[in-house]
A protein has these predicted regions:
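Nucleotide-activated donor-binding/catalytic signature segment of Leloir-type glycosyltransferases, i.e.
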Residues: 224-248
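Short hydrophobic beta-strand element within catalytic cores of glycosyltransferases
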Residues: 282-285
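Short alpha-helical donor nucleotide-sugar binding micro-motif in glycosyltransferases
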Residues: 252-257
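Conserved donor-binding/catalytic core segment of Leloir-type glycosyltransferases
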Residues: 128, 170-189, 195-198, 212
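Aromatic "clamp/platform" in nucleotide-sugar-dependent glycosyltransferases that forms part
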Residues: 265
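Membrane-proximal helix-turn-helix segments that form the acceptor-binding/catalytic region
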Residues: 106-126
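Glycosyltransferase donor-sugar binding loop
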Residues: 39-42, 210-225, 243
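Donor nucleotide-sugar binding/catalytic pocket of nucleotide-sugar-dependent glycosyltransferases
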Residues: 122-164
């Protein structure tokens, strides 16, 4: 028996990819043969970690398919042909309308993804939802199979590694309040709402404050430009976009943060909330989607 994990894209530092890799280690420790196949493989992923989905050979009826579902994918369209035991881990799919004005490709793939999820309702044996919110989504889309909630697997030992000294040195112990949000620059994350709240705080409460919006804007350049225009229109200073950075730098930004401010409108889980809790950073968040479930009573909603 082989346990195959399938996903559309395995990326460096992505929550779905990290969950896949963490589960891979658990499966190996249990003594099972296992392999990861993805349609797209980030060049930064160590060679041999995953194989291209097109190279997936014959799957035996005694094997197990675990499909990490988070976007539109050929895997969804092929799913019915696998005659083995099948499990879907549902990470949720961002509503496509968020991307309509910013990236036509993203809009199409997320729209297709929603349609594909519904088509899989009667084609899987079992589902794992990474949040109660995701479980409710699956039920609403017609899934009647057993569904359990299992949060994303997070390798907490990685967060005990040494943070980037340059970031620590530059932004700590200077009397300024550091406001942080981490997550890709994307419309559903509502970075404009974070900026607006920060601008009010900086103007009326504490001029010695700065905002870090950590995350990649790849594919969302139009949205990023709109955020810059919004910052200029508000006349607010000290809004910093570090971009897609190294892991030790992410650790450092959590170390120097005084508060984590999340205004996201759609999250299937939201790993950064757990990261902020790991570093004991106070959290203020908008009560949407899976946010409250992930916080579990922590933070201010």
């Amino acid at each position: 028996m082989v346990v195959y994990q399938l996903l559309a894209t395995i990326s460096f530092g992505d929550a779905v990819s990290n969950d896949t890799l963490a589960l891979q280690e658990i499966i190996k420790k249990m003594g099972y043969k296992t392999a990861i196949f993805a349609e797209n493989i980030d060049s930064r992923i160590p060679k041999g970690t995953a194989k291209n989905y097109s190279k997936l050979g014959r799957v035996d009826k005694n094997d197990i398919i675990i499909y990490h579902l988070s976007t539109g994918s050929k895997i969804s369209r092929d799913f019915d042909k696998f005659k083995c035991r099948k499990i879907i881990i549902y990470h949720n799919i961002t509503p496509p309308d968020y991307f309509k004005d910013y990236n036509d490709g993203s809009y199409r793939i997320y729209k297709k993804g929603y349609e594909e999820v519904k088509s899989l309702a009667d084609k899987t044996d079992y589902c794992i939802a990474v949040s109660e919110y995701n479980k409710q989504n699956l039920r609403e889309m017609g899934f009647t199979c057993p569904i359990d909630v299992l949060p994303i697997l997070i390798p907490f030992e990685d967060y005990d590694k040494k943070p980037n000294e340059e970031v620590i040195r530059k932004y700590s112990d200077d009397g300024w309040v550091n406001v942080l949000f981490t997550g890709r620059i994307a419309p559903n994350k509502k970075q404009e709402d974070v900026i607006r709240a920060f601008a009010y705080y900086k103007k009326y409460y504490n001029p010695k404050s700065r905002l870090f919006l950590v995350g990649s804007s790849g594919g969302m350049e139009r949205y990023h430009r709109r955020l810059i225009s919004y910052i200029n229109a508000l006349g607010v200073r000290d809004v910093i976009f570090p971009g897609h950075i190294k892991f030790d730098e992410i650790l450092a930004y959590y170390r120097v943060a005084d508060v984590f401010l999340c205004q996201s409108e759609h999250e299937g889980f939201c790993v950064p909330l757990v990261e902020a809790m790991k570093f004991a950073v106070p959290i203020v968040a908008y009560d949407s989607s899976a946010i409250a479930g992930t916080l579990g009573g922590s933070g201010i909603l």
